[in-house]
């Protein structure tokens, strides 16, 4: 998606060789008009899949998922990283390692919201090593729901996550795929 690639070129900030900060428009301050265009693109890619739920993980995927859900006319579920008092009853759980934070989390979704008849589209802001996506896929499969695919804002194609998830037979559509990035040369797209 050229619009997202252009925004990354203009406003993304490199920190080291593998960290791209896009917090001015994607995952801290959010450009809702950009999200609307991203949501339209996800709909174009997955419109014939019968999506009934969008699943993401807290926190950075929530904004993109909510805007996209308007176009699919479906609810959003976000996996929580900690069990809280307001999640009662049975839950699906999975472990994920955060690339950004270097921590392992148990992610949780209440069983009442993720049903076997659901057709689920996973949406997230980044795909790097694939751990978050693997954890979300586990939740969908544990629920007996149908996974229609994953919509990713930014994929670091030079890291193993995309190949790993596609190798599991999951359809992955990334709006911006980064071939390489460095402080010296900036970001190069696939």
Language-model segments: what does each one mean?
Residues 124-142:
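Active-site/ligand-binding-proximal alpha/beta "capping" segment
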Residues 63-72:
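Short Gly/Thr/Asp-enriched flexible loops that form oxyanion-binding sites at enzyme active sites
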Residues 52, 118, 148:
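Conserved acidic residues
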Residues 74-120, 187-189:
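Short, glycine/charge-rich flexible loops or terminal/linker lids adjacent to PRPP-binding catalytic cores
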Residues 51-58:
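Short glycine-rich phosphate-binding loop at a beta-alpha junction
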Residues 1-51:
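Active-site-facing substrate-recognition patch
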Residues 6, 18, 137-190:
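PRPP-dependent phosphoribosyltransferase catalytic core
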């Amino acid at each position: 998606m050229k619009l997202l690639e252009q925004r990354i070129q203009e406003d993304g900030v490199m920190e080291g060789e593998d960290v791209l900060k896009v917090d001015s428009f994607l995952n801290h301050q959010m450009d809702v008009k950009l999200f609307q265009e991203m949501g339209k693109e996800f709909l174009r890619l997955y419109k014939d899949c019968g999506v009934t739920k969008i699943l993401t993980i807290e926190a950075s995927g929530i904004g993109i998922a909510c805007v996209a859900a308007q176009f699919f006319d479906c609810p959003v579920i976000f996996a929580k990283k900690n069990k809280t008092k307001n999640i009662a009853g049975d839950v699906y759980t999975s472990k994920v390692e955060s690339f950004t934070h270097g921590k392992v989390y148990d992610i949780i979704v209440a069983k009442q919201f993720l049903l076997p008849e659901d057709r689920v589209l996973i949406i997230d802001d980044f795909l790097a090593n694939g751990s978050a996506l693997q954890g979300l896929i586990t939740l969908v499969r544990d629920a007996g729901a149908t996974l229609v695919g994953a919509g990713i804002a930014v994929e670091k194609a030079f890291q193993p996550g995309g190949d790993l998830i596609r190798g599991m037979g999951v359809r992955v559509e990334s709006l911006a795929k980064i071939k390489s990035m460095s402080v010296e040369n900036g970001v190069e797209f696939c």
